[in-house]
Swiss-Prot record:
It is an enzyme of class 3 (hydrolase). This is Ribonuclease H. Keywords: Cytoplasm, Endonuclease, Hydrolase, Magnesium, Metal-binding, Nuclease. Binds 1 Mg(2+) ion per subunit. May bind a second metal ion at a regulatory site, or after substrate binding. Its cofactor is Mg(2+).
Length: 161
């Protein structure tokens, strides 16, 4: 059995207006290497971008890894570490008997986590955490760049902040 590569991933999402133009930012660190990823969407929500950031990061990995994934989104972290288990058992219905919002991204994030060992960490946003601040900048710049790409899963009647 081989030892898994260990890396750190930092993620953030941004939305102007919520809903409005949005973007995500990712900083991935492996040993002395750093990779940044970001993109923007014409109409989306902050929570969708907070979910998309770790999805993009995890989907970029070609082999199973041991990951410390850090975000300032309690929604994303609690969703993937706590709420998702009940949602899956109840066929993606919440404890209040409503359909899970952003279910397309929750399913995608769940699938993206399966081959990795992930420790999910939370940091307070806008509190001087260097990598989180960089992700915030990447996400905001992507959102401000007048993106034309559609967030195909965004449904105004179903999704919310």
């Amino acid at each position: 059995m081989s030892v898994l590569k260990q890396l750190s991933i930092f993620t953030d999402g941004s939305c102007l207006g919520n809903p409005g133009p949005g973007g995500y930012g990712v900083v991935m660190k492996y040993k002395a290497h750093t990779k940044e990823l970001s993109d923007g969407f014409a109409l989306t929500t902050n929570n969708r971008m907070e979910l998309l950031a770790p999805i993009i990061a995890l989907e970029a990995l070609k082999v199973p890894c041991k990951i410390i994934l850090t975000s300032d989104s309690q929604y994303m972290r609690q969703g993937i570490t706590q709420w998702i288990h009940g949602w899956k058992k109840k066929n993606w219905i919440t404890s209040t008997k409503q359909p899970v919002k952003n279910v397309d991204l929750w399913k995608r994030l769940d699938a993206a986590t399966q081959s990795h060992e992930i420790d999910w960490h939370w940091v307070k946003g806008h509190a001087g955490h260097v990598e989180n601040e960089r992700c915030d900048t990447l996400a905001r710049v992507a959102a401000e760049a007048k993106p034309t790409q559609e967030d195909l899963g965004y449904q105004p009647s179903v999704s919310s902040s």
